[in-house]
From Swiss-Prot:
Residues given in the record as Zn(2+) binding sites: H429, H433
General function of this protein: Secreted metalloproteinase that allows assimilation of proteinaceous substrates.
Principal location listed in the UniProt entry: secreted
Name listed for the protein in its UniProt record: Extracellular metalloproteinase 10
Gene: MEP10
Region forming the signal peptide: 1-19
Propeptide part(s) removed at maturation, as residue ranges: 20-245
Active site: E430
């Protein structure tokens, strides 16, 4: 194949929502700033309105949505070589989503992505493109085929990032006898799984290509893809972290934390339309503990990687009824209640997201997909009272077909300490990292929220969904919400500002991002903008205070669930590593698909209030804000 093609190109595809690692965890403890290895956003995004004006593109038509998408890529990038990624699907709105990866000399350009959205009419609806358009090598420069090269790349990654893996005895084994570009690195210690190395191209921030080894290492707090220069393994061009960290909230669904309600016994809470085997089966086995098709929950006091044999409650007759009070101490005395709460919240959210469109085809987390598309064997590993850290939580999202991993820690900012499993918003926030990473760029690509701005939006989507599900019947647009207030023992929460539609209470606007360089801060701006959109839709359509949406012709009948649905659909439409403007446009297009555009003005007004109006411009250093809305929205105000 392409041997140790240590030639001139490197690629780094953004995979998973990369959240800022708090200063007490993972590589940050070792003085490594992973944010310094991020790539810039580079995707172009053509929305439906632009596609309609391009007669050549709008004329493309076929009953086969993959064929139409392929023809589009050939038209837009006639000189490029590429391959079809095997995660295309038709979503519940009838839109087909197709994903392509650029190749050069037979080697993937890891951040060369092209996503195409095909409407129900068999025509192109919108598309995103981050293909490399500059010079490409005529052939890969080969070096002596030395099988130690992947090992040298591993050593380079370990040294540059201070990754605590011992690799003195590491040896490279090809994953396929005919493939000399993809290796498993045996003989290491300190990782949760054997590291791997794959030869890929990467587009660097200066637009040039570099040939790199994509070295994958999982040490728990950080699950990294490190792009090591193939010719000089002391150079690292880009780092992707599958683990998204955060800080945040549960009891009955909708109760944010123990201050809002009491424990109560709930019977058979699952929905058989979304969890057809209930929460305790997988189609072949019925379990009497917290194991099922959607997840596996257990305690993990040591913080280790093993979980299958960890402790789980196993009550008689599936009666998971355990006492808990925030005054109980130490946390280990209520571990049964903690696991049960985490299990309930994660499964409930799985079912809600399924109703909103995050199903097997689009890459959700299930062991048995029951012939509904996508790749199975990717339940969520749910670790309660995880001993690998404190005052945090995180979620790791590998591509479809590999389990997600949620780790929930004890928080020590109150006395007695507080268990984050009882704060619903934290569970939702973390799980939403899995949602946003699987939908953006396609289920097979968890690297599409890896740039600084897109990674920040990853935090924002997580905060948005966590806030939306906690709304109360008496809430209005004047209701403010903090994030993580209970677990942090701080009424202001863990964000700079509470979420509010009041510009004095929360003054964040689009151009605020010009002065920010940390993903949670950027995410707070994005979630603030979405909070405005949420209330505009609620004011128009009302608010369903029930735990599940009601639909009419596939459209949620109320504003809260409609907002969640449009944001979710926008994730599937937007390009890999989007910026604020592109993500805004994807939500607007999602409304055109779902409702025929009946909510365009409500959306525009929400965006424009926070400077993301029609005149907003994106530049990584000088974003330009705009409070303008389309003329029709001004006429009918």
């Amino acid at each position: 194949m392409h041997g140790l093609l240590l030639a001139a190109t490197l690629l780094s595809l953004p995979f998973n929502a990369v959240a800022h690692v708090p200063p007490t965890t993972g590589l940050v403890r070792r003085g490594v700033d992973l944010d310094s290895f991020r790539l810039n956003e580079r995707s172009q995004f053509k929305i439906s309105e632009q596609v309609e004006k391009d007669s050549g593109v709008s004329a493309l038509h076929s009953r086969n949505y993959v064929d139409v998408a392929t023809r589009l890529v050939k038209r837009v990038a006639p000189k490029a070589t590429f391959r079809l990624v095997d995660d295309h699907y038709i979503g519940d709105t009838g839109v087909g989503h197709v994903y392509f990866r650029q190749t050069i000399n037979g080697v993937d350009v890891d951040n060369g992505d092209f996503n195409v959205n095909i409407g129900r009419n068999g025509r192109v609806f919108s598309y995103g493109n981050s293909f490399h358009t500059g010079d490409v090598p005529e052939s890969n420069l080969r070096v002596k085929e030395d099988p130690s090269n992947p090992v040298q790349a591993l050593h380079g990654a370990l040294k540059a990032l201070r990754i605590p893996i011992k690799a003195e005895r590491a040896v490279a084994e090809a994953t396929n006898e005919e493939d000399d570009e993809d290796f498993v690195l045996k003989g290491t210690s300190g990782a949760l799984a054997d590291p791997t190395a794959k030869l890929v191209y990467l587009m660097k921030n200066d637009g040039s290509l570099a040939l790199t080894w994509r070295v994958e290492t999982d040490i728990g707090d950080n699950w990294l893809l490190t792009y090591v220069d193939a010719e000089d393994t002391t150079k690292v061009h880009n780092v992707v972290d599958y683990v998204a960290h955060a800080t945040y909230k549960v009891y009955r669904w909708g109760i944010a934390d123990p201050t809002e309600g009491e424990l109560e016994v709930i019977s058979d809470p699952w929905n058989l339309r979304t969890s057809e085997f209930t929460w305790h089966g997988n189609g072949t086995t019925r379990f009497s503990t917290t194991i099922g098709n959607n997840g596996i929950a257990q305690s993990n006091p040591t913080g280790g990687s093993e979980y299958l044999n960890n402790y789980r409650p196993q009550p008689a007759d599936l009666k998971f009824e355990y006492d808990y009070s925030p005054s109980m101490n130490p946390p280990s005395t209520y571990i049964d209640a903690s696991i049960t709460q985490l299990w309930y919240s994660a499964n409930t959210y799985h079912d809600l997201l399924y109703m909103l469109g995050f199903n097997e085809r689009s890459g959700n987390f299930e062991t048995n997909n029951n012939n509904q598309g996508g790749k199975g064997n990717d339940y969520v590993i749910l670790n309660a009272q995880d001993g690998s850290g404190t005052n945090n939580a995180n979620f790791a999202t590998p591509p479809d077909g590999r389990p997600g991993r949620m780790r929930m820690y004890i928080w020590t900012r109150a006395n007695p300490p507080r268990d984050v499993c009882f704060e619903e918003g934290t569970v939702v926030h973390e799980y939403t990292h899995g949602l946003s990473n699987r939908l953006t760029g396609g289920p097979a690509n968890s690297r599409c929220l890896n740039a600084l701005e897109s990674g920040g939006m990853g935090e924002g989507w997580s905060d948005f969904f966590a806030t939306a599900v906690r709304l109360k019947p008496k809430d209005t647009r004047h209701t403010d919400y903090p994030k993580g207030a209970w677990v942090a023992n701080n009424p202001r929460g863990v964000r700079q500002y509470v979420y509010s539609t009041n510009m004095t209470t929360n003054p964040l606007v689009y151009t605020t991002v010009n002065s920010l360089n940390q993903v949670h801060a950027i995410g707070t701006v994005w979630a603030t903008i979405l909070y405005e959109v949420l209330w505009n839709l609620i004011d128009k359509h009302g608010k369903n205070d029930g735990p599940t949406p009601k639909f009419r012709n596939g459209v949620p009948t109320d504003g809260k669930y409609l907002a969640m649905k449009l944001v979710l659909d926008g994730l599937a439409l937007q390009p890999c590593n989007p910026n604020f403007v592109q993500a805004r446009d994807a939500i607007l297009d999602a409304d055109k698909i779902l409702t025929g555009g009946r909510n365009q003005c409500e959306l525009w007004k929400g965006f424009a209030k926070r400077e993301l109006g029609t005149g907003a411009k994106w530049d990584p250093r000088n974003r330009v804000g705009s409070t303008r809305v389309p003329v029709i929205c001004r006429i009918f105000t």
